[in-house]
Amino acid sequence: YPDALMQFEQTYPGARVLLMEENYRSTPEILRAADAFIRKNHHRRPKTIHPTRASGAAVRVIYAMDRADQYPWLVNMAASVQEETAVLYRNNDSALPLIDLLDRGGIPYRCRRMDDAFFTHRIVADIRDIIALAHDQTDAEVFLRIYYKVGGGISKKAAEYACQKSRATGGSILRELLGFPQLSQYGRDSAAALLTMLPMLLQDTAAQGLSRIWDGLRYRDYAERQKLDGGKYEILCLLARQETGLEGLCRRLDELQALVSAPSLPCGGGLILSTVHSSKGLEYDTVYLLDVLDGILPAVTEPKNAGQQDQYQEERRLFYVAVTRARNRLYLFACRNRESAFADELRRELPREYIGPEDVFASLNTEPCGKHYRHAEKGGGVIRACCRGQCMVAYASGETEFLTLGQMVDRRAVAWRAPDRPAPAALPREQAALPPSGVRPGQRAVHRVFGPGTVLSFRDPIVEIRFPAKGDKKFVLSDSVQRGLLRLEE
C-alpha cells in the first residue's frame, strides 16, 4: 500500500502528485497530536496537515489503574451521552466486556454484527470443556478432548482405557485412570491433581475458577506451547468479574454469542462501537480509544525483522486513522499497569498546562489514580481512574462511584485528632515524698496541675484537698506523691 504511493511517479512517468494537506474534519488540537505522531513513520511522503477549523477542546487522557477500569468509565459516559460518540478498538474482543456491561445496564448502543470467533476459539472451548468435566466426570467425549492439555503423563492408551472402564462401571474416568497398570507416576500425579481440583471449580467464583484452570491445572503451559492467543483468557477474566460462578459465566457466554451474532444489534442513542478498520472514512463528534495497549494496538512493539517493521508501520497508520476519526473531542486511556507505546507517544505531543508554584491548584496537580479515599458513608475506596477533575472510586463493598474533586472534598470522612501537648514537668524527686510528720487537716499542698491547696481530710489512702481555683479534689495519696503529681508541705 505505501509502496504504490511512494513509487507513483516511477509507475506513471510524467504524472503529477497533489498533496491533500487541508483537514476539514478535526480541531487543531486533535490534528496537532495526530500529525506529530504520523510524522515519525518511515517510508512516507513529507507533508503537514493544516486544520481549517477553529480551536476546540484539548485531547484528554483518562488515567486508569488497569485495563478493566476502562469499561466502567465508558459505561458511565454512555449512560448520559448526548451527541454522536464512538468507542473505537483494534479487535472485536475488546468490545465484549463493554457490550456485556451495556446490556446489563440497558444502555442503548449501535454496533455492527460480529462473528463468533471469540466464542469458538480453542482457549474458550477448552476452558468450557474443563468446566463441563468438573460437572460430569463420566463424560468420555469431553475427557478425550482435554486430558492431554491439563497436566501430563497420560497416554492416549491410558485415557481410552479409563473411558472404557468408566462406561462399564459408571464411575469417574479419573478414578478409573488411576487403576491403569502402566500409568507413570507423573501421570498418576496429574490424575490425582485433576481429581482434587475439578470439584473445587464448582465452588469457586468465576474469577477464581479461571485462575485455577489457567495456573492450577496448568492449562497456561499448553496454551503457550501451542502459541495460542492468551488475550482470549484475559477477556474471559474481564467477563468473569460480573459472574459469581463458572456455570453462570458459561451461560453468559452463550447469551453474548447470540447477542453479537444477531442480524441486527441493539440500536439507538448516540453511542457507536466499532473497530478502527470499520471506522475508516467515517467521523464522529467524540471518540474514545479503547485498549490502546502493547500487544493489542500495536500488536508488535519491538519489530525484529523487515516483516515486523512493515507491520509496525501499518499499526502506526491504523492508530492515526483512529485518532483522526474525532471531530471535536478525543479521549484515550493510559493504564498504569500496562505499557502503551502509542498512547505514551501521543501524550508526549500534548501541550501541558503550566501551573506556577504559588497557584492554589499547584498542590492538586498530582495524579490521584491509585490513591485511597474514605467516604463519610460508604467507607474506604481506591481511585481507579481519573480525568480532568473527575474520579472513579471503587469501594470495598464493590460499588463504583464517579465524583468530581469538589464532591470528594464535601463527602469525605474526616478523622479528628487532639493537638499534642507537652507533659507537665514532674516535681523534683527529693520533693516526691511524704513529710515525716504525716498528713493532717489544714496542711499546705501543691499539685502539679491544680496548684496550691489545703488538706481537708485524710483517710488512708484517700486525701481530700481544697484548691481555691478548682474546688475540692480527692487523690490516692501514695500514688500521687510517687508519680510526682502532689507535694505536701510541713
Predicted regions located by residue number:
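Structured surface patches comprising rigid loops and adjacent beta-strands/short helices at the edges
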Residues: F402-V414, S478-L488
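Helicase P-loop NTPase motor core
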Residues: P2, P13-P108, A132-D136
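C-terminal accessory regions
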Residues: T286, V292-E399, L403-L405, A413-D460, ...
